[in-house]
Amino acid sequence: MAVTTSKPRVGWSSIEELEVDLLLEAVYRVGGFDFRNYARASLWRRIQNRLRAEKVDTVTRLLDKIVHDASCMDRFVRGLSVNVSAMFRDPGFFQALRAQVFPLLRTWPYIRVWQAGCSTGEEVYSLAIMLAEEALIGRCRIYATDMDESVLDKAREGIYPLEPIQKYTQNYIRAGGTRSFSEYYTAAYGNAIFRPALRDQVVFARHNLVTDGSFNEFNLVLCRNVMIYFNRALQERVHHLLYDSLAHFGVLGLGSKEMLSLMPLRDRYEELDAPHRLYRRMT
């Protein structure tokens, strides 16, 4: 098995570094999931968590278990995938969408949106609510994608625990919501069940930013808080993918810690709202 190794990180032994390289190569070859260019610091923490969860004491033993046990492979992939999401997360971003991006979307007769790395779907429903309030949802198609089919199943259900709903309500208000947030869900058995109509214009599908290509031309692409887990080479690869997926004058939205200014394609965009990481493709 040919593996490209790199300089050991601080706190890693050279053997651990080699074990991790072999593990990630095996996961790619056997399972088709490519974590080889994820940022190693956060990756190592997640691998350590998997060691404890699987009750093995070395990465090599974890590798053996993953290769010979499909359920262990599934658990490993879920454990390494980043599935942190919330409704109207970063309310200022959604305010900026409403104020600066939606007026641009109105200029297109039909609007295609790509929510890349949608996780369990909270941000997808947040976006659908805002588009509905701006009377845009009827001429939209939202493509919500993730590499993990299990989180896509959760997103398709649109059922979330009631516990964080109070926080989500405050986020909705701060994001400029114009109605009562409770109108969008029904409370039952400790869960908030979101209105099925919110996903009428949503297509949930599996797509891997690391290995898959562009599949449509979009007026708005949101890829937020995903690339912070990638190394520089993979970030550049994904930025090219997002650029290729944008229509001319389409808008790209990134996470608060993700900087377009550090990427090779930065000169092909204009800043719409730099603090909220909103950029418009110009060439």
Question: What are these regions, as identified by a protein language model?
Answer:
Residues 248-256:
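Conserved beta-strand signature within the Rossmann-like core of class I S-adenosyl-L-methionine
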